[in-house]
Structures are given as C-alpha cells and as structure tokens.
Amino acid sequence: MSDQKPNTPNVPAPPDDGQGAVIAEKQLQRVEPPRVYQVVMLNDDFTPMEFVVMVLQQFFRHDLEAATQIMLKIHHEGRAVCGVYTQDVAATKVEMVQAAARRAGHPLQCTMEVA
C-alpha cells in the first residue's frame, strides 16, 4: 500500500477563536429584486368607457378621478399603464380583467410587459 493522501481540494480550515470553537463567517449575498411588470389596457371601439373606469377601480384600486384619467389616456393614446406589479400579481390582474370583460360581453384587452 502507498502512503498517498486522499485527493481532496485545497480548502482552508475555518477560523477559530483560539479555544477550539469555530467562528462562522457571515457572507453577504446580493439578492436581485423581483422583476416588475406593467399591466397595460388597450383601447377598442366597443367597450364602454364606464366599464373601463369600473374595472380600473375594482381590480386596480384607483379612485374615480385616477380611473377616469387612465381611461381617457387609453381612449386617446390607444393604451395606458394600469399598474406595476410582480409577475404573478400582474398575470392575475390581466386574467381578472379579461374574465370580467368576457362576462360582460366586451372585447377589452389587457396585457403585461416588463417594466
């Protein structure tokens, strides 16, 4: 038999306090914030403005004035951001808006985009 040492990586021993107790080193980890997504509502020629305002109030918690301003931006510019959320929340909001529009018989479209 040979007197070879097992092939182990060169790992430094953990620091100790001089009395045999190992001192744990704290390592800071950078955690990236979650990506955020804009929920965007698109204009169409058929969905009533009142329905759009109601959706903005109900699903995005905008007050009447803010909901009306967003609705007008959708109407005049063709689209507007309703809110910015994490991916799961944004996807849920899009589905809720589209489901409400389908139930009401409106073609209202809502999408999400990386903010």
UniProtKB/Swiss-Prot annotation:
| UniProt-listed SUPFAM superfamilies | ClpS-like
| Entries under Gene3D superfamilies matching the protein | 3.30.1390.10
- List the GO biological process terms: protein catabolic process; proteolysis
Q: Any idea what job this protein has?
A: Involved in the modulation of the specificity of the ClpAP-mediated ATP-dependent protein degradation.
Subunit: Binds to the N-terminal domain of the chaperone ClpA.
Q: Which family does the similarity line name?
A: Belongs to the ClpS family.
Q: What is this protein called?
A: ATP-dependent Clp protease adapter protein ClpS
Source organism of this protein record: Leptothrix cholodnii (strain ATCC 51168 / LMG 8142 / SP-6)
